[in-house]
Every structure is written in C-alpha cells, then in structure tokens.
Amino acid sequence: MFHAGTPLRSLLWVTLSAIAAVAVAIGIAFVVRYRLDDRPIVLPRPRGPHPVGRVLVDWKDARRNRELMVFIWYPAVDGATGPRSEYIPGEWGRLEAEHMLPIPAKRLEQIEVSSIRDAQAASGPMPVLILLPGMGRVPAHYTTLAEDLASYGFLVLGVTPTGSARPAVVFSDGHRVEGEKKPRLDDPAAAQRLVETWAGDASFALDRLARDSRFVVRQEGAGIFGHSFGGNVSLHALAMDPRFTRAANLDGSLYGDPLSMTGKPMMILCGEVIDDEWKAPCASGAATCAAFPNAEHMDFSDAAAYPSRFPIPKRMLLLGNVDGPEFLRGIADRLRAFFGGARLQ
C-alpha cells in the first residue's frame, strides 16, 4: 500500500520492476514451451521432377594445403529410395547444434531434409552450380535452395570455407578446424585475401568434381552463387576463373577489391533495398537486380523456413516479414531461370 508521501521515483521503480518481471516470466514461458516442443522442423520439399541425392565428401587440395568438406546435391535416378541425409551429420552436426541458438540442440539434429543419402546419381550430363555460404555458415544451411535446384537437374557443390565456418568444420577422420571469430572484413586487404581463398576453394571443387566417377557433368562452364560474403565472392570469382560463366549474389555486400566487370551475367538479390555499392552495375544493366522490401538477411537461408517457432522477435534474428518457404521457392525460381534451367540429356 503506497501512501501520499511515497516518492515518485520509488513508485516508478516498483512499476518498472513489475513490468520487467512480467516480461521475463512471459519470455521464460515461451522459451520453455519452445524447448518442450518435440515436433521436428521439416524443410520445404523440392518441387522438381527428380528425386534428390546428397553426398558429403572430404577433399584435400595439396597444392594450397587446404582440406574442404563439400556437400553435393544432385538429381538421383528415377525411383531412388533410401535413408534421408542428416542435416549436418555426426559430430559436426552435434557441434553445430550446440552453437545454433536459439534452436535447441536436439531440434537442429532432427531437421528433416528430402535428399537421399548417397543415392545413385542420374546419368546426366548435369549443369554444375557452386554454392558458397555466408560468413560463419556452412552449405547445409541452404539445403532448401540446393535441394530444389537439384530436383530440376542441377548438381550443386556446397563448398565449406575451412577457417571461416564457425564454430568449426569437422572432417571425416574426426579432426576439426575452428573458424575465425572476427574476420577483418573492414580491412580491404584482409577481405581480399579471404575472397581469393574462397574463390580458390570453388575452383578446386570444380577440378575435383571432374575426377569423381559418380557424376557426369556438363563441360561448358559452371555457375556460382552464394549468400552474404559467399555472394560477394561469387561475383569476384567471375574474373578469377574462366569456367565460371554466371554468378548470383544473395544479399551480400561488397568486400575486398573493387569488382571487376567481366561482361559475364550477374544477378544481385537484396533484402529490403539494393546496397549502394551495387547501384551502378544494376543501373547500367551489368547485373540483373531485385530487392525484397519485407525480407531480411537470413531469409535467404533455411532460417526462413522456421521463424514462426522462434520464441524471440524475428527481426532480432535478421528475419523479415515474409512467408519463409514461399520466399525461398521464389529465390530458387529466380536462380533456376538465371542459370538457364536444367534438363538432363
């Protein structure tokens, strides 16, 4: 019971404390409910005519002293059956799950994908796309896009950037390489070194794929696309490897050296607005560009497929006000159209 002589400051403090306590209680209730929810997260199903296979390979680049874990999504033979791939398998998946807040660890491990583990590949030849993730991410975080593209006939090489993927990359023999926590992207020289390393990884993956007898691929070049820093690298890669004939950037800013204009087709898709550094190539017609006013940065990843079950506001997770699965389908459609469609021969 407050009396007339109670200081206003005390009343205000009590009121604010009560509001804070209620907010904390509501927040805890949401988190508890979310963590007790055992429903698995099911990613959107691919829409194309082909079943999708996936293999995970450990490739060593002796020339550059690099080792890479590469996710390969591809069209499988008609009628292919078998166990589904794990979203991120084994110890790597467990390590990733421990650090993927606010998603409870067991929920990340139970994400349901459509690709069949180690399924026999269709006879091909298949057009090839390189997929580069955002900084700190791994290609599996873009499974929805990769599976949809593969179901329409593309072979998608998701290259994990060793030393940049966080918290770590776990290799087939169990050893791990931790990712740099604070890459110096504001230093143009340091950023350019990363651009060259990631682009070198993409080129090596193309070299190594050509020696993999499981896949028959088209020889007339490859496309490359990525999200965030991976999208930035994709555009740079056009000038670094003549085999890359087209590149798409999903909401990535420009880092490293100024972009070299090669005359090769580019596509730039941004959340909310076109970044200032891309306005010149967009205006000149050097790049095909589009912005999505209601989308945020992480809507270009699988995170868009399950934001409604997060117990915190989507904006805090860099997620916008879009229908996540529908948005990803639209991005996949744009990628497929830009890279020319795919028909197995």
Task: Give residue spans per PLM region.
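C-terminal catalytic-base region of ester-bond hydrolases, centering on the histidine
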Residues: G285-Q345
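Domain-level recognition of soluble alpha/beta enzyme cores
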Residues: V32-L129, L317-N321
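The feature captures the conserved acid-bearing segment of alpha/beta-hydrolase catalytic domains
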Residues: T245-D302
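Short substrate-entry loop that stabilizes the transition state in hydrolases
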Residues: I111-M126, L131-V169, I274-D275
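N-terminal membrane-anchoring alpha-helices
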Residues: F2-P49
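Primarily recognizes the serine-hydrolase "nucleophile elbow" in alpha/beta-hydrolase
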Residues: F204-T262
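Short, solvent-exposed beta-strand-terminating loops
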Residues: P75-W92, V159-S172, A287-R309
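Alpha/beta-hydrolase active-site loop
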Residues: G163, V169-Q219
